[in-house]
């Protein structure tokens, strides 16, 4: 007796809400079982790397907010570190603490969205509503410090744009005190929930070897049991002064990756607490006039200061010739910036390494043999944002 069954081809996205952006996924299905998953990218390509080649180093910063628009400050951080490496400039300690503080707030901002939307994709509505309430508070901190809720444009080569407004540290401290009980509530809904575990446990398993071979990083790598975190292995700013653990999983499945992200938020809370306690006084920008604009008070008194300000924001500053690569531990994984300077005021090349690009490549082998519904779970646990994948 011959088997006359044939596979069907199914197009998922790019308009489907569960694809988390403009992912077009071509699935080869044998009934409900996935044989192959072919992701098509590029629908959000905006030529960011090429655009940066025609902007000064200051004008390039806002482009990084628009890559992974869920965790903008972490990407600004990588670019600022790369420019500082070429300039060999000292960053004031207060600015370093502020950067680390907001990088960890950004990590919470990212993970709350991921866990909430992952729960919604699987059918649980409550976690998304609860977590969005907490995200709103963090976005208010963004707005108070930078004037914008999402595209902050706050980090600068040599420091940050402005000092923290009065009362902000106290409000962040209050938020951090009330946030852990909210996380406990989410855990009580999900951790031992029978339906949640049935949808996540043993789904999308990634072994340690596969995670390394595919170039995974962040929670995708740590979920497979590899304790690799750039904040520990290659610390930047004041991360070497912070005490925190690196959560890892055991089985490398969707449940482990969910749990790693949940535990990372508790570690971020520890780091934020330490930043608030240790926050020094002092300047938030380097005192190099080539990099730092004059104050508004000076501009009202001095024509030279006004000219200096105008030149800084139009012509920018020359960066010494050379090349560098700097990476940060962004919420989704290793976000890196390769900069090549020819000694002028615009970069000759700015290559961006986004973690989601490598993670999406692994979707095919992670999905094979699973049900169609499991593909949605795997996409959610990849934590992909197409701003950074398509660039």
Curated annotation (Swiss-Prot):
GO cellular-component term (any): plasma membrane
The protein's Enzyme Commission number: 7.1.1.-
Catalytic EC class: translocase
UniProt superkingdom: Bacteria
UniProt entry keywords in alphabetical sequence: Cell inner membrane, Cell membrane, Membrane, NAD, Quinone, Translocase, Transport, Ubiquinone
Keyword Transmembrane helix listed: no
Location(s) in or outside the cell: Cell inner membrane
Main location: membrane
Membrane topology according to the record: Peripheral membrane protein
Disulfide bonding pattern of the chain: none
Subunit details: NDH-1 is composed of 14 different subunits. Subunits NuoB, C, D, E, F, and G constitute the peripheral sector of the complex.
Family: Belongs to the complex I 49 kDa subunit family.
PANTHER family tied to this protein: NADH DEHYDROGENASE [UBIQUINONE] IRON-SULFUR PROTEIN 2, MITOCHONDRIAL (PTHR11993:SF10), NADH-UBIQUINONE OXIDOREDUCTASE 49 KDA SUBUNIT (PTHR11993)
Functional summary from the UniProt entry: NDH-1 shuttles electrons from NADH, via FMN and iron-sulfur (Fe-S) centers, to quinones in the respiratory chain. The immediate electron acceptor for the enzyme in this species is believed to be ubiquinone. Couples the redox reaction to proton translocation (for every two electrons transferred, four hydrogen ions are translocated across the cytoplasmic membrane), and thus conserves the redox energy in a proton gradient.
Protein name: NADH-quinone oxidoreductase subunit D
Organism placement in taxonomy: Bacteria, Pseudomonadati, Pseudomonadota, Alphaproteobacteria, Rickettsiales
Gene that encodes the chain: nuoD
């Amino acid at each position: 007796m011959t088997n006359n069954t044939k596979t069907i081809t199914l197009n998922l996205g790019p308009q489907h809400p569960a694809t988390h952006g403009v992912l077009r996924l071509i699935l080869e299905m044998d009934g409900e079982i996935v044989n192959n998953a072919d992701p098509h990218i590029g629908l959000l390509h905006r030529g960011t790397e090429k655009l940066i080649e025609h902007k000064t180093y200051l004008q390039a910063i806002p482009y990084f907010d628009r890559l992974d628009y869920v965790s903008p400050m972490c990407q600004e951080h990588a670019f600022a570190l790369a420019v500082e490496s070429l300039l060999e400039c000292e960053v004031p300690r207060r600015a370093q603490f502020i950067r680390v503080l907001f990088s960890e707030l950004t990590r919470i901002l990212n993970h709350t969205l991921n866990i909430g939307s992952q729960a919604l994709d699987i059918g649980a509505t409550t976690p998304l509503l609860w977590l969005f309430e907490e995200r709103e508070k963090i976005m208010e901190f963004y707005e108070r410090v930078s004037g914008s809720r999402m595209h902050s444009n706050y980090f600068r080569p040599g420091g940050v744009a402005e000092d923290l407004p009065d009362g902000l540290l106290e409000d962040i401290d209050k938020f951090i005190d009330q946030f852990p009980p909210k996380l406990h509530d989410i855990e009580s809904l999900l951790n031992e929930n029978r339906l949640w575990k049935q949808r996540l446990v043993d789904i999308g398993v990634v072994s340690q070897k596969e995670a390394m071979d595919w170039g995974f990083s962040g929670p995708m790598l740590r979920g497979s049991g590899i304790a690799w975190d750039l904040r520990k292995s290659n610390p930047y700013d004041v991360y070497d002064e912070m005490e925190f653990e690196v959560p890892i999983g055991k089985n490398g499945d969707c449940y482990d990756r969910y749990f790693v992200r949940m535990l990372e938020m508790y570690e971020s809370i520890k780091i934020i607490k330490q930043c608030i306690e240790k926050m020094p006084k002092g300047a938030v920008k380097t005192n190099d006039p080539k990099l730092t604009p004059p104050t508004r008070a000076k501009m009202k008194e001095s024509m030279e200061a006004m000219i200096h300000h105008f030149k800084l924001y139009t012509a920018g500053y020359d960066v010494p010739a050379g090349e560098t690569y700097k990476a940060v531990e962004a919420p989704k994984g290793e976000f890196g910036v390769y900069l090549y300077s020819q000694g002028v005021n615009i970069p000759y090349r700015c290559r961006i390494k986004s973690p989601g690009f490598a993670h999406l490549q692994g979707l095919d082998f992670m999905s094979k043999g699973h049900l169609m519904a499991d593909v949605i779970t795997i996409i959610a646990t990849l934590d992909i944002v197409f701003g950074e994948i398509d660039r």
